Amino acid sequence: MTEIYIIRHAQAEGNLYRMMQGNWDGDVTPLGLRQIDALAERFRHVKIDALYSSDLYRTRVTASAITRWHSVPMQLDARLREIHMGSWETEFFGNLEYRCPEKLHEFIFEPDRFSLDGAETYAQVARRASEALREIAANNPDRTVAVVSHGVAIRCMLSEVLGIPIGDTEHLPIPSNTGVVHLFYDKGSFTADYINDFSHLSGALAVRPGNQISLRHEYIDPAEHRDY
């Protein structure tokens, strides 16, 4: 039986500023670095035989929490990347809430219906991310593996391998930053022990998705806004 820990990356700039990160390669915030310290302590005495990560910067930095105490190479896999958001890459949530609230609602609450020019669909992400996870599990029989990925990508891969509808946000939430999913893999099947455990974070380190304010960040021309 293979034991798998799937970890979402620490808080990055896009999380702090409520921006669609997608494949944009932003930095990890100071709070995110503290989350990584807490994550490292959580896994200090957990046996880890192999480590895989998305090749984006925020996941590679988060994966260093594992290499801090475990002498395992970090194996990068682009299939573990976050969903590509097409024309929404680097857009602020506040702008999207103002300009296209219906489409943003679809992205968050009706993911099986979401489509956007140039962006991946949830189904496409589920296929590539679950393919990577199945390959990792099959290549590591009877070992303990850590996999560092992204919020939507984790949600998509879990939907695929656990058979949970992608729209079931109650049983399939987007993990918190450095939130941990614990799976077991045996004879081609996955079972979940827990999803989104962030007990290693305390106080201000435990930033939950959706608990942040989304601001607009657009230039307003006073000549075009005479509503005062």
Predicted regions and their residues:
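Acidic, low-complexity terminal tails and accessory targeting/binding regions
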Residues: 2, 83-95, 143, 159-228
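Generic beta-sheet signal
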Residues: 4, 135, 143-149
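Active-site-proximal alpha-helix that buttresses catalytic centers in soluble enzyme cores
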Residues: 7, 11-72, 76
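Active-site metal-binding loops of divalent metal-dependent hydrolases
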Residues: 10, 151, 198
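Amphipathic, non-transmembrane alpha-helical scaffold segments
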Residues: 25, 29, 33, 56, ...
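Glycine-rich phosphate-binding loop signature in dinucleotide/nucleotide-binding domains
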Residues: 44-47, 136-143
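Short beta-strand scaffold positions
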Residues: 53-54, 127, 148-149
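Phosphate-handling substructures
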Residues: 70-128, 184, 191-197, 219, ...
